[in-house]
């Protein structure tokens, strides 16, 4: 019973729960040594050990002539030598690099013996003072000597080989081949009966042949390339085997008073409608100029590209006559001209 009361009613003594360890905020030995060394490195010479400023020394002189106090800064020897080289006058000789920071302790460096080596800046200044020579891109092993011998005599034959005077086809001949041999050989060749002077064969650029002349005096119904009422499919059938630039004029299927220009391009057949302005002028598209009649428009664009999108590079070159529609496919495709093949 006593054990039950002690365990369940907490009437007996109870142990406290475990507590986390108490943090130690004391400074370690390594950190303390580092801090002391840091204070020594950046010690102010005008302060005492307690960090208080030293009292000013009062003298009998005028205080306005007292020099201000300066802090001492540790300077490396290499930095001091570099600063002296930058701040020194141009005519001053550079001093030798030493381990001391005091410039008064450095001794001037004796001039080094001439070993043939020169700094790039000095070499550039020396080369600018000397007369400029042509830049030599490569070494010539047979370079002639520019200096003459002291005795005044001839400097001897040049080591550079003489240019080979033989033609390209006679490299197998001996070295003693001379000009007279070449002259005689070419004279016999040129004076022969079979020699003919042929002009230089230059390839002239091919120019397209001009289109067939369109007679503007004839009416539209009497033009050979006017087919009258013709369906779209029949026009495409006629132009399917024709060359690029072939054309015909036909009447529309839906509206008999409208004329259509059927044209063969590199992408197939194109059908363009002729329109009339208020002044009864004929135009072909928005960018076409007005013309009095369709034959005059066809004559104009037989020598100029059409102002129609998709046919800017085309002209009305090859008319498809009405007689060809009764004979069958376009006979112009049977004999393609040079530079133009079947589309």
Swiss-Prot record:
Tissue: Specifically expressed in brain.
PTM description: Tyrosine phosphorylated by ABL.
The keyword Protein biosynthesis appears for this protein: no
PROSITE patterns listed in its UniProt record: SH2
Comp. bias intervals (Acidic residues): 92-102
Biased composition (Basic and acidic residues): 29-40, 73-82, 160-176
Domain SH2: 225-320
InterPro entries per record: SH2, SH2_dom_sf, SH2_domain_adapters, SHD_SH2
UniProt region (Disordered), positions on chain: 1-176, 322-343
Keywords: Phosphoprotein, SH2 domain
One Pfam match: SH2
Function, in words: May function as an adapter protein.
Protein name (record): SH2 domain-containing adapter protein D
Underlying gene: Shd
């Amino acid at each position: 019973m006593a054990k039950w009361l002690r365990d369940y009613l907490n009437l007996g003594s109870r142990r406290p729960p475990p507590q986390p360890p108490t943090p130690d905020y004391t400074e370690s030995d390594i950190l303390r040594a580092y801090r002391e060394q840091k204070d020594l490195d950046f010690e102010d010479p005008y302060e005492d050990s307690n960090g208080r400023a030293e009292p000013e020394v009062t003298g009998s002189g005028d205080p306005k002539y007292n020099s201000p106090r300066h802090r001492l800064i540790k300077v490396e020897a290499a930095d001091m030598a570099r600063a002296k080289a930058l701040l020194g006058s141009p005519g001053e000789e550079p001093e030798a690099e030493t381990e001391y920071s005091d410039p008064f302790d450095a001794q001037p460096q004796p001039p080094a013996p001439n070993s043939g080596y020169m700094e790039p800046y000095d070499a550039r200044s020396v080369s600018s003072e000397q007369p400029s020579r042509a830049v030599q891109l490569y070494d010539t092993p047979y370079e002639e000597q520019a200096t003459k011998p002291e005795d005044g005599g001839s400097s001897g034959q040049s080591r550079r080989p003489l240019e080979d005077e033989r033609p390209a086809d006679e490299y197998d001949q001996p070295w003693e081949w001379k000009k007279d041999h070449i002259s005689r050989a070419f004279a016999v060749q040129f004076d022969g009966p079979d020699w003919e002077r042929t002009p230089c064969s230059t390839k002239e650029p091919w120019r397209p042949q001009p289109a067939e002349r369109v007679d503007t005096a004839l009416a539209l119904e009497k033009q050979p390339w006017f087919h009258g009422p013709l369906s779209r499919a029949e026009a495409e059938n006629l132009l399917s085997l024709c060359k690029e630039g072939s054309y015909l004029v036909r009447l529309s299927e839906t509206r008999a008073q409208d004329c259509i220009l059927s044209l063969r391009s590199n992408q197939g057949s194109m059908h363009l409608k002729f329109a009339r302005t208020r002044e009864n002028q004929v135009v072909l598209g928005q960018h076409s100029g007005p013309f009095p009649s369709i034959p005059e428009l066809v004559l104009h664009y037989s020598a100029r590209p059409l102002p129609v999108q998709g046919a800017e590079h085309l002209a009305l070159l090859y008319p498809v006559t009405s007689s060809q529609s009764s004979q069958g496919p376009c006979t112009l495709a049977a004999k393609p001209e040079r530079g133009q093949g079947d589309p």
